[in-house]
Amino acid sequence: MRAEKIKYPMGTLTSEGALIYDENVSGKRPAVLLAPNWMGMTDKAVRRGELVAGNRYVVFVADMYGAGTRPVDFQEAAALANPLRADAIEQRSWVRSAFETMIAQAKARDLIDAAAQRSAFALAAATSWSWRVTAPLWRQPCRSMVI
């Protein structure tokens, strides 16, 4: 299993997500965008991405706070997440940046095909915003799945 740290722009911030895939599997696979819980892009989020990826998917674990910003406890996570949760436009921008990065990075490694640009599944912790962020972004029907 390969988990590559990928830096990408998110508004005025630079974020650092993880592109995860089984390098021993050949052929194209569906891509899955994984939005971690409000603790952000932790080792646990990457391990969850590895479990989801298995030998069937390419997974991108998104970074919602920016590279190097990692909450250490519940209170700090709340302080970082609440402004994002209150701003639907920023949420959409965050998800779109992560989605576009996932598609570009996976295509560059020849892991997905062009059809992947028209669909996405976002896996997120059960939050009040996960379902409403994914659907309107790409003007295509898009489903979200909560794990």
Pin down the residues of each PLM region:
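Predominantly soluble domains enriched in secretory-pathway, periplasmic, or organellar proteins
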Residues: M1-R2
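Serine-hydrolase catalytic machinery in alpha/beta-hydrolase-like enzymes
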Residues: K5-L111
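Primarily recognizes the serine-hydrolase "nucleophile elbow" in alpha/beta-hydrolase
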Residues: V95-I147
